[in-house]
Amino acid sequence: MSVKVFCDIADLNNIKKFNNNNFVKGFTTNPSLMRKAGAKDYESYSKQILKVCNKKPISFEVFADNPKLMIEQGIKINNWGKNVYVKVPVINSKKQFTGKVIRNLNSRNIKLNITAVYTAKQTAKILKTINKKTKVIISIF
């Protein structure tokens, strides 16, 4: 089995430190971690992170709850860099499966990190939704 270690952080100093560590293969973050790290503007802070971490994979999460807006944000986030994965929660705040969002972004060959996955049923739905040609990370909690 191959295991890759990803840091779930948003603090720039810690990202700099772990980015130089070969054991760490990439990063993931989310809007609440970024707020906690002092980010005032999501996009500009994300781009600061990308100046530090421009070779290892990094996931930036959509923060919209509406499928149309999630897709729009996902497309925009994807354009920030070749090492970017778009992080999409498996369900929205209404407990609805985000399959439409996942399918749409995946069909555009956008790399995804599908997050907040808690059940085998959710994992199975994701696997039925993705095209399996484009890179996808499934973050199981």
Model-derived features: positions:
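Active-site beta->alpha loop and helix N-cap motifs at the rims of alpha/beta catalytic domains
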Residues: 2-3, 9-16, 21-24, 28-108, ...
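Catalytic alpha/beta core domains of metabolic enzymes, predominantly
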Residues: 110-141
